[in-house]
C-alpha cells in the first residue's frame, strides 16, 4: 500500500494539539517544511499558521483548491464537498463523537452507563450458561 495522505493544498486535517483541538481544517498553503496555512470555514477558525506536528492528516481532500486560495473559495468548496458530514460518518469521526459524549456525562449519566453494562453482562452470562447446560 502506498502512502496517500500528503500535506497538500486542499487536504483536510484534524488539529491534534492546542486551543483548536479536534477541529477540522483545510490546508491552504505550505509555508515551509514545518508550518502550513490553514482555514476552517465550519469551526470559526480564521486563517492561521500552524505547525505540521500539531495536525493529523485525514483521507478527505477538497478538490480544486489552489495554493493561497481566497477564504470565500475555500468556504464554498468545503461546503460543496460536505467535509463535516463525511468526517462524521467515518470511524475516526464516530470515535471522537463518542469520546466527547462520554466526557460530557455527569455522575448520574456515568451511573446509568454502569447499570446498563451490568444488565448487558448479566444477560450474556445467562445465555452462556444456557448454552453450556
From Swiss-Prot:
InterPro entries: Rib_uL2_dom2, Ribosomal_eL14, Ribosomal_eL14_dom, Translation_prot_SH3-like_sf. GO terms for molecular function: RNA binding; structural constituent of ribosome. GO terms for biological process: ribosomal large subunit biogenesis; translation. It comes from the Eukaryota. SUPFAM superfamilies: Translation proteins SH3-like domain (SSF50104). One of its GO terms (cellular component) is cytosolic large ribosomal subunit. Pfam families: Ribosomal_L14e. Gene3D superfamilies: 2.30.30.30, 6.10.250.2270. The keyword Ribonucleoprotein applies. Keywords: Ribonucleoprotein, Ribosomal protein. PANTHER family: 60S RIBOSOMAL PROTEIN L14 (PTHR11127), LARGE RIBOSOMAL SUBUNIT PROTEIN EL14 (PTHR11127:SF2). Belongs to the eukaryotic ribosomal protein eL14 family. This is Large ribosomal subunit protein eL14. It comes from Griffithsia japonica (Red alga). The gene is RPL14.
Amino acid at each position: 500500500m502506498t502512502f496517500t495522505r500528503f500535506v497538500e493544498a486542499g487536504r483536510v486535517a484534524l488539529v491534534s494539539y492546542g486551543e483548536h483541538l479536534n477541529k477540522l481544517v483545510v490546508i491552504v498553503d505550505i509555508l515551509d517544511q514545518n508550518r502550513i496555512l490553514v482555514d476552517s470555514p465550519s469551526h470559526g477558525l480564521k486563517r492561521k499558521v500552524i505547525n505540521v506536528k500539531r495536525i493529523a492528516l485525514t483521507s478527505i481532500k477538497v478538490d480544486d483548491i489552489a495554493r493561497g486560495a481566497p477564504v470565500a473559495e475555500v468556504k464554498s468548496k468545503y461546503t460543496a464537498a460536505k467535509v463535516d458530514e463525511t468526517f462524521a460518518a467515518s470511524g475516526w469521526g464516530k470515535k471522537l463523537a463518542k469520546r466527547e459524549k462520554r466526557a460530557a456525562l455527569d455522575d448520574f449519566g456515568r451511573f446509568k452507563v454502569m447499570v446498563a453494562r451490568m444488565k448487558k453482562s448479566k444477560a450474556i452470562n445467562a445465555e452462556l450458561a444456557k448454552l453450556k447446560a
